[in-house]
Design a protein with these regions (language model features):
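Positively charged n-region of N-terminal signal peptides that target proteins for export
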Residues: 1-4
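Hydrophobic helical h-region of N-terminal Sec-dependent signal peptides
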Residues: 6-16
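C-terminal segment of classical bacterial N-terminal signal peptides
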Residues: 14-25
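N-terminal secretory signal peptides
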Residues: 29-85
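Short, internal acidic amphipathic alpha-helical interface segments
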Residues: 35, 89-130
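A mature extracytoplasmic/lumenal domain signature
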Residues: 59, 71, 80-82, 95-97, ...
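A short, solvent-exposed beta-edge/loop patch
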Residues: 116-161
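Short, low-complexity, Pro/Ser/Thr/Gly-rich segments in the mature regions of secreted, periplasmic
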Residues: 159-169
Length: 169
């Protein structure tokens, strides 16, 4: 038993003496390249156009990058957040629904009874209800990763607009 403990101690001492950490010559390592986490507004716009949406030009106002989309009688916007070098890590679908039917009670009922899309009410001469859906973009997924969130958005946006009393022209 004593021999085994002695042999283990000897092996550990030899291994430690050969370690680059104890000789002062640590091996340099290169950090792995980080993939861009996100999508560009141009590729998201091209993708939505390919799906049949009418996409407006990319705009930047007050530090926010976005474009408008018209589809099925509704106009909504895609906002981009967490952008570095033109690649954005978060996307937000957003729509403003105007009309006297957009009451605080209806917006609160929406938030209570529905998942995924969040909404808020703005009192003004013409009250509005704004609805939003936030999406975190993953590395390497490309625009295809927006397929399910866009399907949820396109399914629930008309429902929200209808519940707020909006009738498409």
């Amino acid at each position: 038993m004593r021999r085994l403990a002695l042999a283990a101690a000897l092996i550990a001492a030899v291994a430690l003496s050969l370690s680059p950490l104890t000789t002062g010559t640590a091996l340099a390592q290169t950090a792995p390249a980080t993939a861009n986490r996100g999508l560009t507004p141009a590729e998201v716009g091209a993708w939505i156009t390919g799906l049949g949406g009418r996409v407006g030009p990319v705009q930047t106002e007050n530090g926010q990058t976005f474009f408008a989309v018209t589809n099925a009688g509704l106009t909504w916007a895609v906002f981009f957040y967490g952008c570095e070098a033109g690649v954005c890590g978060e996307v937000q679908f957003s729509a403003v629904v105007p009309g006297a039917g957009a009451t605080l009670d209806k917006v609160n009922a929406w938030n209570r009874d529905n998942r995924y899309l969040k909404a808020f009410h703005t009192s003004a001469e013409t009250p509005t209800a704004t609805v939003q859906y936030d999406v975190v973009v993953l590395s390497g997924g490309g625009v295809a990763q927006l397929a399910d969130p866009l399907a949820v958005w396109l399914q629930l946006l008309p429902k929200f607009a209808g519940e707020m009393g909006y009738v498409a022209p």
